[in-house]
Amino acid sequence: MSTISYTAVGRRKEATAKVKLQPGTGIITVNKKPGETYFNYNSEYLSTLRGPLLALGLENDYDLHITAKGGGIKGQTDAVKLGLARAICTMSSEKRESLKPHGYLTRDYRAKERKKYGLRKARKAPQFSKR
């Protein structure tokens, strides 16, 4: 018996998350671990992750199977949020209209700026000496 599933990819900074959304009871697994364990029981990360589902009232209707790579925990959380919103949009276009005003479908393109030669960091210059 095959169940219906919706997949999408989200990215943030160096993090990438593949999100698989299946009808179920609201179980979240990240890299084959429970979501609470993976995100260290941090309620801020878990509420950010569930944001698109909470906006539509679907938090207990779907199971999430997530593969997250790269970056840190915060970047992965935001990548999952974007991937989840995109997966929900593949279900139906009217759900897209309700997610868009909340900003769940917007990719946060900010990333670390590269270091330039002659500088200590991306923009920090060595101390200036007049004489």
Swiss-Prot record:
GO MF, one annotated term: structural constituent of ribosome
The entry assigns this protein to a family as follows: Belongs to the universal ribosomal protein uS9 family.
Q: Does the keyword Lipid biosynthesis apply?
A: no
Q: Name one GO cellular component term.
A: cytosolic small ribosomal subunit
Supply the name of the protein. Answer: Small ribosomal subunit protein uS9c
Subcellular location(s): the record lists: Plastid, Chloroplast
Q: What is one process in the GO biological process aspect for this record? A: translation
* SUPFAM superfamilies to which the protein is assigned, alphabetical: Ribosomal protein S5 domain 2-like
Can you name the source organism? Answer: Emiliania huxleyi
NCBIfam families listed in its UniProt record: PRK00132.1
Q: Which UniProt keywords apply?
A: Chloroplast, Plastid, Ribonucleoprotein, Ribosomal protein
Statement: the UniProt record of this protein carries the keyword Ribonucleoprotein: yes
